[in-house]
Amino acid sequence: MFGASIGRACQRIIDAMVRWLALGHISPNVLTVIGVSLNVGCGLLFGFGRFFWAGIVLIVANLFDMLDGQVARLSGRVTRFGGFLDSSLDRLSDMVVFVGLMVFYARNTEFHSTLNVFLAGAALMGSVMVSYASARAESLIPKCDVGFLRRPERVVLFIIGALSTHPGSTNFFANRMPAVLWVMAIGSYWTFAHRMYHTWRELNRANVEIEASIQSSYSASNSGPERRTEQTLVHKPG
């Protein structure tokens, strides 16, 4: 009950912001660009080891990411280019955050970790492949958004990792980003494999339906003349 009340309160705040931005004739594309700019700042903060502030900036950046689409729908300014811009800059936003983490763990400091650099790089490639698999699959099938580690889940994991990581602390609960990178590295490839399998299954199902339809049409076209011939033979005068 308490959680639902918080959710409703947050939604009312977001709805008010959307209405205000729509009435102010703020372009949804401007909101998209502001969001990606904040994500670039987040990547820089990660690179310098300012994890807590990177988490705060990431929250604000993804608030803009939520607002742009809603403002576009409310103001009637939904465009194909806007959708393309939003999707493209989302990929850039993901990558700059991963790169910031790779820079932090690759620097010649006491926090240097080759393993964490590898995990961040693997998670970066996996997240790109998840997005690419979805985009490519949807040119072949109606929808491909399966998998448990999509972009919203990655953002939440980044925020959890950022706000619960304090470089220099030996406490496991104050250094969660490495664990987050493990989850994202493994989860991204699992989601990629799931989307590959889903696309294969849907294409096979479509092929079976097409073959069944062709076979049905072929049978119907062949049975028609036979029935007409039988009717002619039956009614032919002796």
Short names for language-model regions:
Residues L63-S113:
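Hydrophobic, well-structured mid-protein blocks that either form specific transmembrane helices
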Residues M1-G55, N62, V96-G238:
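Hydrophobic alpha-helical transmembrane segments
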